[in-house]
Amino acid sequence: ESLVSGMRVGTDQLDPQKKIGYLPENNPLYLDMYVREYLDFVARIYKVSNRSAQVKKMIHSVGLEIEQNKKIGALSKGYRQRVGLAQAMIHDPEVLILDEPTSGLDPNQLVEIRSLIRSIGEKRTVMLSTHIMQEVEAMCDRVVMIKLGEIVADEDLEKFVNDKGGLEEAFKQLTS
């Protein structure tokens, strides 16, 4: 059974979904739309009140001010990830789920997106799905490892680093 803000996912179908923001690995964006236009479109879908102000806030919070009047198709992968993060947060969800949010980024974009995700995590719950242990170390406080759909570990990051010989070693031992 999965709960989001005390509501059962699957049973109380609509309410939990409103409390979750999701950025999939392949970040499906409308490449022919402008950044601001796309975020407004997503905000309308979520029935965000004060849409214009929320779009402006998201553009600022993910650092898209300079890019906001460009077509998404003209953006770099790093800026497209920022658009994806903004759309995932446009309705101010309590929980943000990010699937491989840094894949394919260059080193500069990687540092920027990691920092952005860390700052987002100060205000809301962020769940990060990745197989890259360096990403976990850079962005996470808590680690949950899963093998064949079952949780095999759920610890603070420090415990893995200090007591289990590091994340990669723990991952090998727990998932082999």
Predicted regions and their residues:
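Conserved ABC ATPase signature
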Residues: 71-78
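Conserved ABC transporter NBD signature motif
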Residues: 1-11, 15-16
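A short, surface-exposed alpha-helical micro-motif characterized by mixed small hydrophobic
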Residues: 136-138
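Catalytic Walker B motif of ABC-type/P-loop ATPase nucleotide-binding domains
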Residues: 96-100
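ABC ATPase "signature
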Residues: 154-155
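Conserved ABC ATPase "signature" region
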Residues: 40, 44-67
